[in-house]
Amino acid sequence: DIDKHMLQILKDEVDNYKAAYNLVDFTDMIEKFNVSELCPKYDVVFIDEAQDLSPIQWKMYDILKKNSKHVILAGDDDQAIYGWAGADVQRFQDEPAKNIILPQSYRVPQAVQQIADQILNRIPDNRRIKKQWASRPEGGSVDHITSIEDVPLHEGDWLILARTNDKLIKLKSILKEMAIYFEIKGRKSYKTRLYTAVK
């Protein structure tokens, strides 16, 4: 576990490094914008994936909103995935605006929608915006797999997502046992030439 004191030390080190090499990161750019509040006038500002905005991004939005004729926020509170990084989905839900819910999805097939609805309907009404929408016309399919060994990983390319690095480490050892080539954060499980030769 890292406590606040250690985080502050790490932050100070990163800040010193950036200052020494005259570097600016994405957060620095937003903070500079927010402090200066120097903002051009816009006719329209369109912000996508607004459910995943962090508090400093919402402050930036407030400044843009004051300086724009029209602001469009596009997002879906059911797809909020950056709470761990400080995203404020409640702010998205509470934003006073005219809500337009798109009635049709061209991405989600019916089988996936049915399972998603089973999960989403368990969320209390005060925690999400209720919405009705139609799935893609094709039925699609959902496979219920209880073990990674049951996934045909030798066929085609796969992307495996895990909630934590700890889970990835466990998957890594399983994939090695199965002699499956993989990359995690750019690191190859074994040399590409060896993989090609074995394949």
Labelled PLM ranges:
Residues 1-46, 55-60, 73, 83:
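Accessory N-terminal region flanking or inserted into the helicase ATPase core
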Residues 19, 31-40, 61-63, 89-92, ...:
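Short, flexible, glycine/charge-rich loop motifs used to bind or transfer phosphoryl groups or to couple energy/partner
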Residues 24-27, 110, 144:
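An alpha-helix initiation/capping motif
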Residues 44, 51-138, 155, 159-177, ...:
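Conserved helicase motor core of SF1/SF2 NTP-dependent helicases
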Residues 141-156:
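Conserved interdomain hinge at the start of the Helicase C-terminal
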Residues 198-199:
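Conserved helicase C-terminal RecA-like lobe
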